[in-house]
Every structure is written in C-alpha cells, then in structure tokens.
Design a protein with these regions (language model features):
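Negatively charged, low-complexity tracts enriched in Asp/Glu with abundant Ser/Thr
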Residues: 1-41, 50-91
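Single-stranded nucleic acid-binding surfaces, predominantly the OB-fold ssDNA-binding core
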Residues: 47
Length: 91
C-alpha cells in the first residue's frame, strides 16, 4: 500500500476538513473527520441533530486510500447533505 498522499489529495483533504468545520459551526449537526496517516485513510461521520452520548452517527465515508478522487467524492456527499440542512438552517 502506498502511504504517500499527493499534493492534490492533501489540498482536497483540507477542503473536506473545512466543510466538516463549516457544517459543525453553521448548523446543529456535528460533523467529525478522522485522519489516520499511518494507514493513509480517513473517515467522516455526522450527527444530524448534534452530538450526544446516545446519538448514532451517520457514516459518510470510510476511505482506505487517500486520493483526490476519493476525497472529492466524500466532499460531494457532504455538499448534498448541506443542501438538505439548508432548509432547516444556514450552512
């Protein structure tokens, strides 16, 4: 497994993290992102009604290879979720 992440994938990963922060700061939803550099992987999950000890997370992505394409696909999923949330709150 190649553990090196390309510059374009790193940039996309930063965009993904920014979107997670924007969702968490702009809505009642809580968006989490885990980055595992030793595995070259990441995961994103969401609590639509905010985090609580008893709430279940909605898994958005569990990616085992950080590529620009994989990260952009996850970002597209989050964009669709943002559109759904915009009816309730402003992201």
């Amino acid at each position: 497994m190649d553990k090196k992440t390309t510059e374009s994938a790193k940039k996309a990963l930063c965009e993904l993290l920014t979107k997670c922060v924007d969702i968490s700061n702009g809505t009642k939803a809580a968006c989490f992102m885990d980055y595992e550099p030793h595995l070259n992987s990441y995961s994103v999950f969401l609590h639509r009604d905010g985090w609580s000890p008893t709430s279940e997370a909605e898994w958005i992505a569990m990616c085992k290879a950080i590529t620009k394409e994989n990260v952009m696909a996850t970002l597209e999923k989050l964009e669709k979720i943002c559109e759904e949330l915009e009816g309730k709150e402003n992201v």
